[in-house]
C-alpha cells in the first residue's frame, strides 16, 4: 500500500508512529491504533479500528508493525471521503436534481442534523458562499469550498 502514498505522507506517518513505538521495535500496541490514526487526521470509529485489526489478524493486545499501519491508514483514508459524503447528502435533498439548495434549508440542516453546528459555526462556513438572488446555493461549489485542504503554514 505504500506505493499509493506520497513520500511526505509516509514520513509524517512514520514520525507519529515512532512516538507510540515506545520499545523501539518498529511496532505500536494495537490499543494505541485509534489514537495514532486520529493524530494523523483520520476519524475512525472504534468499530472500524477493530475491523482493521481483524483483517490483519491482530488481537486487541497485539502489536501493529509499520507496514501494516501504512495499509490500515491507506484504507481508512480511502473510505473517508468527506466531499463525497456531503455531496450524497445534498443530492438526497435535491429532489428536482437542479444542483441547488435554499440557503435557509442548508442552514437548518447544518444546525439540526448530524453533528449539529452552532449558528456561529454555520456563519463561518457560509462566508464567501455565493447565494443567488432567489436565495439558492449551488451545493457543489459549497461542498468544494468547505472541503478544501487547510493551508499548512
Swiss-Prot record:
Give the record's keywords alphabetically: Cell projection, Repeat
Its main localization is other
Q: Which GO terms describe its cellular component?
A: microvillus
Which GO terms of the molecular function aspect are on file? calcium ion binding
Q: Where in the cell is it found?
A: Cell projection, Microvillus
- UniProt domain EF-hand: residue ranges: 8-43, 44-79, 81-116, 117-152
UniProt GO BP: brush border assembly
Which Pfam families does the record match to this protein? EF-hand_6
Stated family: Belongs to the calmodulin family.
Oligomeric state and interaction partners are given as: Associates with the IMAC/intermicrovillar adhesion complex.
* Protein role: As part of the intermicrovillar adhesion complex/IMAC plays a role in epithelial brush border differentiation, controlling microvilli organization and length. Acts as a light chain for MYO7B and is required for efficient targeting of the IMAC to the tips of border brush microvilli.
The name this protein carries in UniProt is Calmodulin-like protein 4
